[in-house]
Amino acid sequence: LKPTGRGPLQLTWVDDDVSLLPCQMYLHEGEISPIDPRAQLEAVVGKVRAAGLTPVCATELEFYLYDVASTGMQPPLIPGTASRMTAGSLYSIDLLEAFKGFTDDIYAACEAWDVPADAAISESGMGQFEVNLLHTDDAVKAADDALLFKFIVRGVARKHGLGATFMAKPYGEDAGNGFHLHTSMLDQSGANIFDNGTDLGSPVLASAVAGLLDTMPDSTLFFAPHLNSFRRLREGTHAPTTASWGMDNRTAAVRIPAGPNAARRFEHRVSGADANPYLVIAAVLAAALKGIEAEATPPVAFTGSSYDQELPRLPASWEEALVRFEHSDF
């Protein structure tokens, strides 16, 4: 193991002088290990840059807090009360205020570790939250940040007497935890090649989407790496089940968000929060580059709910995803 250069990072939420030193795997001969996920992402980023492009990435990670003192997994008690959460509180300001001590410590640790934590929201599940990380033109750092953020959340939760999980589907009836990846591409002049001044975005954006959709079934193992991951990928659960794309459509696997043209990008919504961020970003960037270089054309963007339409299906089980991955030439 050799340090990545990101650290040592002091654990701000513990009293002892303890630090984390992120490392990468190397072979005895001194070469980087071919199975190191960070190295795989570095290799893909190198290919994107060799094509004259710079990927810009931002991540969104969802997680659940739970009561570690209870028998079985249960939602947490609301701080300052003896009341347990009994329902989700989507976008609740009151809930964020109640957990302010927890989120304040999250932001303090992120600032100390140069993890660009931005907006925090309460999600639809009981004790479920999401934190957005700001975009960066360093895709490897984006993956580092996502991994470090998960470490921070778990550690700060322990400080507050809570548990935190990024499991894809911790509760059978509540929403799963997603890892959403926003991506745009800059040319050598720094211009966003996905922006052509329209809401639809440029033909290059369409080609990137085509690459994503074409490779998505074969790549699902990266996005859903565990048996539990496939419990999240179910219809009507705020998670995609098809290789599909749409304009500002949250049932799609690939969403083109509304907003300023200069920020035109795609949002990849398949991955669970349990996925390896290095492998997810590597797979997404490689797929987008494949589509761009082939000048591929995607199917027509769908409207409405993807759950109600005949669209190409993603693997529905771990076994199916393994078979698709093993026989893929991507």
How would you label these PLM feature ranges?
Residues 1-330:
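Glycine-rich, acidic/polar active-site loops that bind/position phosphate-bearing ligands
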